Amino acid sequence: MFTPIDQAIEHFKQNKFVIVMDDAGRENEGDLICAAENVSTEQMAFLVRHSSGYVCAPMTNAIADKLDLPLLRTGMKFESNDDDRHGTAYTITVDVAQGTTTGISAHDRSMTCRALADSSSTPKSFLKPGHICPLRAADGGVLQRRGHTEAGVDLCKLSGLSPVAVIGELVNDDEQGTMMRLNDCQAFGKKHGIPLISIEELAQYLKK
């Protein structure tokens, strides 16, 4: 059913997407995830086309602190985020300041994500608010919190890339825009040659 984690990591290292499923008792959704470091305009367009269009950029707390990206509710700690059903740590949204226009195009959003992963970026590199939503990952990764946010950052770390990912929730191409569940994600992955993994199996891999 799922691609072995080591094979998925090798795929991810090549600047390619991986589909990550969470637990059926949690969101029961698949996220399309790639590394932000080298995300292309074409990849961003593919992500927007097949997802809800709400593109997020999971990152470590260290990077979020360096870039001065506070949580949407000032002073709210990760553990106290009761306003989001699954405790997702949303920060203020951003656009990269140089080289973009409105910030919403695939070109502009890919530039913003690459800038978030660029170690030379500073708080002044970004306009706030913008069209990319950074997410703060739990420091312990999926071993602390079984979320897509943490899975994205863990995949980047395991691949030797900057720990900033790009994620979007996969949706079906139907009139209601329903969320893709496991069977849908399996079919989508097979059609597009994208590995499918689960957060639980990623956690077990990290425990080894």
UniProtKB/Swiss-Prot annotation:
Binds 2 divalent metal cations per subunit. Magnesium or manganese. The modification S-glutathionyl cysteine is found at C56. It comes from the Eukaryota. Its EC number is 4.1.99.12. Pathway: Cofactor biosynthesis; riboflavin biosynthesis; 2-hydroxy-3-oxobutyl phosphate from D-ribulose 5-phosphate: step 1/1. Gene3D superfamilies: DHBP synthase. It catalyses: D-ribulose 5-phosphate = (2S)-2-hydroxy-3-oxobutyl phosphate + formate + H(+). Its cofactor is Mg(2+); Mn(2+). GO terms for molecular function: 3,4-dihydroxy-2-butanone-4-phosphate synthase activity; metal ion binding. Mg(2+) 1 binds at E27. GO terms for biological process: aerobic respiration; riboflavin biosynthetic process. It holds the Pfam family DHBP_synthase. The modification Phosphothreonine is found at T3. GO terms for cellular component: cytosol; mitochondrial intermembrane space; nucleus. Mg(2+) 2 binds at E27, H148. D-ribulose 5-phosphate binds at D31, T88, R145, R146, G147, H148, T149. Keywords: Cytoplasm, Glutathionylation, Lyase, Magnesium, Manganese, Metal-binding, Mitochondrion, Nucleus, Phosphoprotein, Riboflavin biosynthesis. The record marks H131, E169 as: Essential for catalytic activity. S-glutathionylation of Cys-56 is reversible and dependent on the cytoplasmic isoform of glutaredoxin-2. It is found in: Cytoplasm; Nucleus; Mitochondrion intermembrane space. Its main location: cytoplasm. Present with 5460 molecules/cell in log phase SD medium. Homodimer. Catalyzes the conversion of D-ribulose 5-phosphate to formate and 3,4-dihydroxy-2-butanone 4-phosphate. Also has an unrelated function in expression of mitochondrial respiration. Belongs to the DHBP synthase family. This is 3,4-dihydroxy-2-butanone 4-phosphate synthase.
